[in-house]
Amino acid sequence: MHRCTISHIDPDSPLRHAAHPGDRLVSINGNPITDVLDYKYYAYDPELAVCLRRPDGTEHTVHVSKPLGGELGLDFETYLMDNAHSCANHCVFCFIDQMPPGMRPTLYFKDDDARLSFLMGNYMTLTNLSEREVQRIIHLHISPINVSVHATDPELRSFLLGNPRAGKTLEIMRRFSDGGITMNCQIVCCPGLNDGAQLQRTMHDLAALYPKVHSVSIVPVGLTKFREGLYPLTPFTPEHAAETLDLVNAFGDECVKKFGARVFFCADELYLKAGRELPPEEFYEEFTQLENGVGM
């Protein structure tokens, strides 16, 4: 069954008398529908010409009216109306690689999907985006999105992510910035790899994209006992956590002076590891990175 095949029609849907389960959504106002982003974007308007394809292959177009931004009331085989895009990286710090065996299969799926970034807040690395997808994000103004940056040095980022394409991320982020796309970013900080001077460089490069780089969280690498055969990583010590806090907060202070916003925030875990008190509420401004363990 095609992913854009309708599985259910809401009783209050403006298409309740025209659409049936098993019909395929072909286009809205002449725009082909390939996934949930197309569907939500083109179904936003109040006046719609909806093309449906019956199971026998015949097509018909239905004209409907609804409130601006109102739902069409259609459900599909999957939420994305497509397969989720899987991760093409081999990150040295991947948390899924460190999970215990014997858990449900869905926990081992590595997604790296711009649609889930926009709709669900998942982080994406940009390494598996085609040129068409980059252009579509800009054209549809899919914003804000969450980007896992980790480093802006091309060679270092390629190493961290285990992907030679990873070095092109800053170039894509500049295109998104020029296209009006807001990005919230994260840096998984690994002692001896992307900390210190490399972290300073990454923050400097990302600050150059403010305000489209709206916020950046610095999160300590998480390590479990299930690391056999994986790259040897070093956990944060209290001293190293304190050094990282000082580096990031000093840079954030400069951003406050320059932009009126801190932009860069350390995860609560670094404060706890360093034995320091968490900052006051006003320090976290909009709490943009709350779900990434910042300001909880």
Spans of model-derived segments:
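PDZ/PDZ-like groove recognition
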Residues: 1-10, 14-15
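Short, surface-exposed secondary-structure edge patches
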Residues: 12-18, 40-41
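Conserved PDZ fold ligand-binding element
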Residues: 16-34
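PDZ-domain C-terminal substructure recognizer with occasional recognition of PDZ-binding tails
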Residues: 40-76
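Conserved Radical SAM active-site core
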Residues: 59, 66-212, 222-247
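Flexible glycine/acidic-rich beta-alpha junction loops that bind and position SAM and/or redox cofactors
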Residues: 193, 213-240, 259-282
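C-terminal accessory region of radical SAM enzymes
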Residues: 244-257, 263-264
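Active-site loop ensemble at the mouth of alpha/beta enzyme cores that anchors a bound cofactor
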Residues: 274-296
